């Protein structure tokens, strides 16, 4: 799931959320907005078992995927588009 909240100016707060049944262990959101760097936006487990991380982004198009332990890649069906290159987010 992806939540978007428009902030003052041209920034949007984007919250990425994975369900409880996602693979165990650390998961990072990696994408064009962070140089595809694992660990830079690591997801935090919430009390309800979901995992989230929030980033602020200016307008644009961003490719991203979730990277789980063991090199497991996950896409987000809530993205604006999903294809063989991953998920696409339009702000």
Q: PLM features: residue spans?
A:
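N-terminal edge beta-strand
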Residues: 1-10
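Aromatic-rich carbohydrate-binding modules that target alpha-glucans
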Residues: 9-59, 67-91
